[in-house]
């Protein structure tokens, strides 16, 4: 039997239902009737736009994970043209903003290449500015040869700049209007105009507190350099030029993208550059962001580790600077002539560059802080921007003699037991008027009866003239190429290939015949041979390891942005080999050992009492025209278990023996650092 429903319960449920209906109706009334107008106005005045979200660029690290270059975020001010030019007096607003920027100690970007006050004249222009001004003159219907005064007159009229403004204020307004306008001229391919880069909070606050319209704050990344070392290797970034855009646009780059311009930043652009994202940004009537919804998340660039050891790079730069400046400070007739130089150190087993130093160098952190800074560095007489280690080309002098020795031994021209009498003069062609001398002849003595090992120790010209006379020059050139001399090294940065002296090279350079004297001079590292310090270091490493020449790539690994995923690991690549017997290698290596460890050796004074046994070769490259000789020095250590090969070049350094101390200072640091960095590299990378 069913229980009867009590009337009280029915009444209670009915009351509860009625109460809920009343609450819903009241809420609906408030939403649509009371607050409806406000919501309508807010929605009507809200603006949603799709914006690009810049991706962070990848970091650059040394071989042990120490950060060399990373990013720092900054606030930029950009103009909102739709808002700015809806105002009654946009020119007045621009002038107000420019004055506010100056009062806050910030600087703004003015692309107009015209002086700041009359009489107006064009200023010096870079390539981008020239393209920009040509495009604007064409747009304006002005002649390409229009004067700055004619251009300013056009700007005053075109941009409706009131005559009440002073000439200086008119120039400020014209510069900003020009900078904005050129972004909308077809086919100029200019990056987005950023009014103030890395704006201070004082500036942003001042503009907002004064309700200055027409601008927006965006966030971007700038490169932060954690070291003042390796400036020539790291390189720098910048906005694309119109020419660069034609290449990068096929890869999906926007015109406003920042790209690598030089060094590792350029070489490894494909890894370092991230992929921008997009977001829907909603702003209310006052311009305040009320919502951000990512439609595509930005993907940051990858983390690139170089083969360079930061500690060794520091040691290389310090040793080179100290050595050259000491040479300059000496009161000798040649001290004023001492110029720039380079030191390169590579791993014998892999060919990986561990340090690449140049003198003079520069500081990437300050180079682009102002036009004055850049001009001072770029126009300096001693060329600090020139990468001597990779682009400098120098005659190797006697450092080439081990190559001649290997060629002679391998081709059977000599054996390890062959002895050649040094008489001070090579007389074979004396009847033709050509009788080159050994360097020691000026002292009134000779080297005696040398074998190949002793000839390397003594650097006897007569011995190597004899070998060179018996070797076809193209055969000697083939061995030089196998050692990497006059060949690409495999480094990812711009480099000179140099040249080995041959009949074809002389014909190309001078359109004259090849003579026997050319072969003799080529055999001792003179003639037309020119090599880079990096090539000399890799050549020395090839001697040290018994004939295997590796690529000089500076890329070690590529990891994901946070370092959690290994994307690419560079393995040692063999570029060529020098095939000869172990006996031949031992004879040449022993000769280099004696250079540093026998009292008759030219580097004995520097390395005779050194704690690690070193093998070395000094070189003096004659320049002619009464110029002071270049000094060349190569070495590897330890002699019995080679780990590192070093090449040092000092322009007008007089003689190779005089710069051996630079290499010694570097090796002091190398063997100190080596005891510190003994943990496996995989473990060290986890400690970063």
Task: Please identify what each model-predicted range represents.
Residues 1-272, 276-297, 333-334, 339-342:
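Membrane-proximal periplasmic segments of bacterial cell-envelope enzymes
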Residues 36, 58, 66, 73, ...:
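Solvent-exposed coil/turn segments that connect beta secondary-structure elements
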Residues 245, 273-276, 284-287, 317-325, ...:
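Amphipathic, well-packed alpha-helical segments that form the structural scaffold of globular domains
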Residues 672-681:
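Flexible helix-coil linker/hinge segments at domain or subdomain boundaries
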């Amino acid at each position: 039997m069913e229980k009867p429903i009590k009337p009280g319960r029915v009444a209670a449920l009915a009351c509860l239902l009625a109460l809920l209906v009343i609450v819903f109706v009241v809420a609906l009334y408030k939403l649509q009737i009371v607050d409806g107008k406000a919501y309508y106005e807010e929605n009507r005045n809200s603006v949603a736009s799709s914006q690009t979200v810049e991706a962070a660029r990848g970091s650059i690290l040394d071989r042990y994970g120490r950060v060399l270059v990373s990013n720092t975020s900054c606030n930029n001010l950009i103009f909102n043209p739709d808002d700015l030019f809806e105002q009654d007096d946009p020119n007045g607003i621009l002038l107000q903003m420019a004055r506010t920027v100056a009062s806050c100690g910030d600087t703004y970007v003015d692309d107009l290449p015209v002086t700041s006050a009359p009489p107006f004249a064009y200023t010096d222009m870079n390539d981008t500015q020239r393209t920009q001004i040509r495009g604007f003159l064409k747009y304006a219907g002005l002649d390409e040869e229009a004067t700055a005064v004619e251009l300013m007159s056009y700007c005053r009229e075109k941009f409706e700049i009131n005559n009440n403004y002073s000439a200086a204020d008119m120039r400020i307004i014209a510069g900003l209007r020009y900078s904005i306008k050129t972004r909308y001229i077809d086919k100029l391919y200019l990056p987005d105009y950023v009014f103030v880069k890395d704006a201070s909070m004082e500036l942003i606050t001042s503009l907002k507190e004064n309700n200055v319209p027409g601008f927006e704050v965006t966030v971007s990344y700038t490169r932060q350099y954690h070291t003042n070392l390796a400036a020539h290797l790291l390189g720098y970034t910048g906005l694309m030029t119109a020419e660069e855009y034609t290449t990068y646009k096929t890869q999906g780059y926007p015109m406003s993208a920042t790209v690598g311009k030089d060094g590792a930043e350029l070489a490894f652009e494909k890894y370092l550059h991230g992929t921008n994202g997009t977001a829907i940004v909603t702003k209310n009537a006052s311009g305040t962001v009320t919502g951000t919804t990512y439609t595509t998340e930005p993907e940051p660039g990858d983390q690139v580790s170089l083969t360079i050891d930061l500690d060794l790079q520091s040691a290389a730069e310090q040793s080179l600077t100290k050595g050259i400046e000491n040479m300059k400070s000496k009161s000798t007739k040649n001290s004023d002539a001492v110029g720039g130089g380079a030191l390169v150190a590579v791993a014998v087993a892999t060919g990986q560059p561990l340090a690449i130093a140049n003198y003079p160098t520069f500081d990437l952190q300050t180079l682009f802080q102002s036009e004055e800074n850049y001009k001072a560095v770029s126009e300096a007489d001693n060329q600090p921007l020139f990468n001597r280690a990779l682009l400098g080309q120098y005659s190797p002098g006697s450092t080439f003699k081990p190559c001649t020795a290997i060629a002679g031994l391998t081709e059977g021209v000599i054996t390890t037991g062959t002895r050649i009498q040094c008489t001070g003069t090579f007389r074979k062609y004396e009847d033709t008027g050509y009788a080159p001398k050994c360097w020691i002849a000026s002292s009134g003595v000779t080297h005696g009866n040398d074998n190949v090992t002793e000839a390397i120790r003594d650097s006897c010209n007569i011995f190597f003239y004899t070998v060179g006379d018996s070797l076809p020059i193209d055969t000697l050139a083939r061995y030089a190429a196998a050692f990497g001399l006059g060949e690409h090294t495999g480094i990812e940065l711009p480099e000179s290939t140099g040249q080995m002296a041959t009949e074809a090279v002389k014909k190309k350079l001078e359109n004259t015949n090849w003579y026997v004297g050319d072969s003799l001079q080529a055999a001792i590292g003179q003639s037309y041979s020119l090599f880079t310090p990096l090539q000399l270091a890799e050549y020395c490493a090839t001697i040290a390891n018994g004939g295997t020449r590796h690529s000089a790539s500076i890329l070690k690994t590529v990891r994901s942005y946070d370092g959690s995923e290994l994307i690419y690991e560079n393995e040692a690549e063999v570029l060529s080999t020098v095939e000869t017997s172990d006996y031949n290698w031992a004879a040449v290596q022993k000769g280099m050992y004696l250079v540093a460890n026998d009292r008759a050796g030219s580097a004995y004074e520097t390395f005779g009492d050194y704690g690690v046994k070193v093998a070395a070769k000094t070189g003096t490259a004659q320049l002619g025209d009464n110029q002071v000789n270049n000094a060349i020095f190569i070495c590897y250590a330890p002699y019995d278990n080679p780990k590192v090969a070093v090449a040092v070049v000092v322009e007008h350094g007089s003689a190779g023996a005089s710069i051996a101390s630079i290499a010694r200072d570097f090796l002091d640091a190398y063997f100190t650092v080596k005891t510190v960095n003994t943990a496996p590299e995989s473990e060290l990378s986890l400690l970063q």
